[in-house]
From Swiss-Prot:
One of its GO terms (cellular component) is cytoplasm. PROSITE patterns: AA_TRNA_LIGASE_I. It comes from Buchnera aphidicola subsp. Cinara cedri (strain Cc). GO terms for molecular function: arginine-tRNA ligase activity; ATP binding. Keywords: Aminoacyl-tRNA synthetase, ATP-binding, Cytoplasm, Ligase, Nucleotide-binding, Protein biosynthesis. The gene is argS. It is an enzyme of class 6 (ligase). Gene3D superfamilies: Arginyl tRNA synthetase N-terminal domain (3.30.1360.70), HUPs (3.40.50.620), Isoleucyl-tRNA Synthetase, Domain 1 (1.10.730.10). A motif ('HIGH' region) lies at residues 122-132. The keyword Transport does not apply. This is Arginine--tRNA ligase. It catalyses: tRNA(Arg) + L-arginine + ATP = L-arginyl-tRNA(Arg) + AMP + diphosphate.
């Protein structure tokens, strides 16, 4: 239950009744300073002062109407105009018990929308590297949450499966004594060097790009083989990462090729694009070049070749006109901001989408080394994502073996995988999305602080309590009740679950979910340390506390699921 939203709705009704404007925001915050106060209304003091003591008198009027409701135990006012709320324990217990028995934690669902999420999107012919981690796991977390909330989620893995790199690869493979697709990355590096240094190779590459566009049989055969091989490798990474992307979610750049000539002619027809020195260019007023003049965006080269911008315009049109999206979220790093804004600007001019469609760039920062430079190998090469994940599992395995030398190999393998991968993902997702962060093995694998191992361990501890009482919690006669302040604080933390879910639905900020998990686990630890659960003298207290433990464990597991992290049975 989202208590803040519930209270805000009730209080706004009173405020409108008292003549305050409909757009007035009462601002309700969880109280963390004063004992015996649950929430505080502090938006009143932001209103323009009319007379002396205006805010205090208005707070008194609002509290008068609030006192008519049975959901409040106590309402007090503090100067200059704060309203302090203590909620009724019976009302709290009714709602926490409803949450306990409900299928989806009694969360309120909005009208479902068709939401497209563009994420991961690696280039073909290269192995996924550490730079793909953020887009992949940020996008996947959002996809899981939106699906849970009943939205029609369309995941789009916009892979780079077209362009000049395939001309280079085809040229190089034709030069090899035997065409082999075993090590595409090595062939790509070789082809790139030849393309840069060898003028003959450069010309052949251009010719092979044209041949590929004209669907030459041999070129298409090589292209398909490269794409298939790369997708197979990427899928292994997704599986290891516990990411929900599947083959059906792939819609690469090549998919939109059939639309590109039509996009060019349409933009020219609408006088958005013009011919200039053999190229087709769109001039944008909102973007300036180095000379301070309108920036020109090339959408077709002299040789007739299309650019990434052209493909991305076609892609946006397809998502809006054909897939009928209500909202499109792009998980692309900060450096692509201008490129994305230019696409949206051109597509808006062409009326490829309406104002009703929400376009969002959920940008993110970089992963840095301890020296605050981009996270790379000692040689300066990009770190392969699969190698990073394997290293995480190995490090987790070493930690587990130190604590539990008798653990069986099969069990060790599974637990180390879930802890190692979980640690990498959680460490990333716990950081503010828009900021860069420093990659640190010791911090992410620590059992202390806001880390995956800490949360996974908290879950194990709760489950051990429940396992000892597998039948008692099924008793419907006794409900969750409040006997101490520790239970009350834990219940309020549980109530915040819905609030966090809806913030992530709007903003795609999973660090808030990680902070929430850490707070919830901490509140449970205090409850566990100060309240007797298994040894409670009275049956109704014992059952109440076990049920509260069960609900906490379910929410921790669900939050970890949203983050794409698996729980473990032991550590």
């Amino acid at each position: 239950m989202n208590i803040q939203k519930f209270l805000k709705k009730k209080i706004k009704k009173i405020c409108i009744k008292l003549g305050l404007p409909e757009n007035f925001n009462p601002i309700i915050q969880k109280n963390i300073k004063k004992k015996n106060i649950d929430y505080q209304i502090n938006g009143i003091i932001k209103l323009k002062k009319k007379k002396s003591n205006y805010h205090y008198k208005l707070a008194k009027k609002i509290s008068y109407y609030m006192n008519k409701s049975k959901i409040y135990k106590k309402i007090s006012i503090s100067k200059p105009g704060f309203i302090n709320i203590t909620l009724d324990s019976n009302w709290i217990c009714t709602n926490i018990n409803n949450m306990f028995i409900a299928k989806n934690f009694n969360i309120s669902f909005k009208k479902p929308k068709k939401i497209i999420i563009d994420y991961s999107s690696p280039n073909i012919a290269k192995e996924m590297h550490v730079g793909h981690l953020r887009s992949t796991i940020l996008g996947d977390t959002t996809a899981r949450i939106l699906k849970f909330l009943g939205h029609n989620v369309i995941k789009q893995n916009h892979i780079g499966d077209w362009g000049i790199q395939f001309g280079m690869l085809i040229t190089q493979l034709k030069l090899e004594s035997k065409i082999s697709f075993k090590n595409i990355e090595k062939i790509y590096k070789k082809s790139y060097l030849n393309y840069k240094k060898n003028p003959i190779f450069f010309k052949k590459t251009k010719k092979n790009v044209v041949k590929l566009q004209k669907k030459d049989k041999k070129c298409i055969y090589i292209w398909k083989k490269i794409v298939k091989k790369s997708i197979k490798k990427n899928n292994k990474v997704y599986k290891k990462l516990n990411v929900s992307l599947k083959k059906k979610d792939i819609r690469g750049e090549s998919f939109y090729n059939f639309m590109l000539p039509g996009i060019i002619s349409d933009l020219k027809k609408k006088k958005i694009a013009v011919n200039y020195q053999g190229c087709v260019i769109v001039y944008l007023k909102n973007f300036k070049n180095r000379l301070g003049k309108k920036m020109g965006v090339v959408i077709q080269k002299k040789d007739g070749a299309f650019l990434y911008t052209t493909t991305d315009i076609a892609c946006l049109k397809y998502r809006c006109k054909t897939l009928k999206a209500d909202r499109i979220i792009y998980y692309i790093d900060n450096r692509q901001k201008q490129h994305l804004l230019q696409i949206w600007n051109i597509a808006k001019k062409a009326k490829y989408f309406t104002k009703k469609i929400l376009l969002e760039h959920h940008s993110f920062g970089m992963i840095l080394h301890k020296n605050k430079k981009p996270f790379k190998t000692r040689n300066g090469d990009t770190i392969k994502l699969i190698k990073l994940l394997n290293k995480g599992v190995t490090k987790a395995k070493e930690k587990i073996k130190k604590k539990n030398r008798k653990i069986k190999k099969k069990e060790l393998k599974k637990i180390a995988h879930n802890i190692g991968i979980g640690a990498i993902k959680y460490f990333d997702l716990s950081k503010k999305r828009k900021l860069d962060y420093i990659f640190d093995w010791d911090k992410m694998l620590s059992l202390e602080g806001n880390t995956a191992p800490y949360i996974q361990y908290a879950y194990i501890r709760i489950k051990s309590i429940i396992k000892k009482n597998t039948t008692i919690f099924q008793n419907d006669k006794y409900k969750i009740n409040i006997f101490t302040s520790f239970e009350r604080q834990l219940i309020f933390s549980i109530f915040q679950f819905e609030e966090i879910i809806h913030i992530l639905e709007k903003k795609g900020t999973p660090h808030l979910m990680c902070n929430y998990l850490y707070d919830l686990s901490g509140k449970f630890s205090k409850f566990y340390e100060n309240c007797s659960i298994l040894n409670a003298k009275e049956k109704h207290i014992k059952i109440s506390r076990i049920k509260l433990s069960i609900l906490t464990s379910k929410i921790i597991k669900k939050c970890l699921y949203f983050l794409g992290i698996k729980t473990v049975s032991k550590m």
